[in-house]
A protein has these predicted regions:
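Active-site phosphate-binding strand-loop segment of PLP-dependent enzymes
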Residues: 141, 145-197
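Conserved N-terminal alpha-helix of the aminotransferase class I/II PLP-enzyme fold
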Residues: 64-101
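Conserved PLP-anchoring active-site segment centered on the Schiff-base-forming lysine
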Residues: 108-127
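N-terminal "arm"/small-domain region of PLP-dependent enzymes with the aminotransferase-like
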Residues: 4, 9-10, 14-65, 193
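Active-site PLP attachment segment
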Residues: 215-242
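Short, structured coil segments at secondary-structure junctions
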Residues: 115, 135-137, 191, 222
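Active-site-proximal loop->helix
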Residues: 111, 128-137
Length: 242
């Protein structure tokens, strides 16, 4: 399994100590403004499902509306099952859903780093990754596949940054070229940096099991975070991070 960054372990322990960890609760939406969680039927005052359409029995089996933030009103059994299936497919402990692949990229990057940290973003990255880099407030260094020596220099110069994150597409959407993932993982390990790979165009296409460019390159266990989308090869909508 991919090693967990030290700062992430420390941050989680701090939240646990302060009793601030927000668990993901499975909540079944019921008609008439009610819900069921832990076997108990309750009135649901946490949802934004004002007209009850997300829990209308006429949509049973096809309804996908969340109704509110999952951290507030819980996660539906359908979403929980999907996250478990994605985690099993990706051979990871867990997966986290987003409404789109774009949101998965922007949200994940902005959550991992912030002001004072350093991002190393490939010049050909998708706009969603670029937006995530900007939103984070971290200092962004741009690199290319042809000059990884420059990336190494930039990583060395940023050794004082609390967190360092290399961000790249696995397959670049404009030309179909694969990122040099093995070399990027070598640099990430050498300079104690996290690495995030966007598998939007790799999932279902590359790798023995269709898990993408990281699987094809044999670096799944070396990549810290992988982001995927359900709107391309999977033929649906949504995004996820593992």
């Amino acid at each position: 399994m991919t090693p967990e960054p030290d700062w992430l372990t420390d941050a989680l322990r701090s939240l646990e100590t302060d009793d601030l960890v927000r668990p993901h609760r499975e909540v079944e939406l019921l008609p008439s403004g009610r819900c069921r969680t832990d076997g108990e039927v309750l009135l649901d005052f946490s949802s934004n499902d004002y007209l009850g359409l997300a829990r209308d029995l006429r949509q049973e089996g096809v309804a996908a509306g969340a109704g509110a933030s999952p951290l507030i009103s819980g996660r539906s059994p359908e979403y929980c099952r999907l996250e478990k299936r994605l985690a099993a497919f990706e051979n990871t402990d867990a997966a986290l859903l987003f409404p789109t692949g774009f949101a998965a990229n922007t949200g994940t990057v902005a959550a991992l780093v912030g002001p004072g940290d350093a991002i190393f973003s490939h010049a050909d990255n998708h706009a969603s990754l670029i937006d995530g880099c900007r939103l984070s407030g971290a200092r962004v260094h741009v690199f290319t596949s042809h000059r990884l020596d420059q990336l190494a220099s930039k990583l060395g110069e940023a050794s004082g940054a609390p967190r360092r994150l290399i961000v790249t597409d696995g397959v670049f959407s404009m030309d179909g070229v694969l990122a040099p993932l093995e070399s990027l993982c070598d640099l990430a390990e050498k300079f104690n940096s996290m690495i995030l790979v966007d598998e939007a165009h790799g999932t279902g296409v590359h790798g023995t099991n269709g898990r993408g460019s990281c699987e094809a390159a044999g670096v799944e266990d070396r990549v810290t975070f992988r982001v995927g989308t359900l709107s391309k090869a999977v033929g649906s909508t949504g995004g996820f991070v593992v």
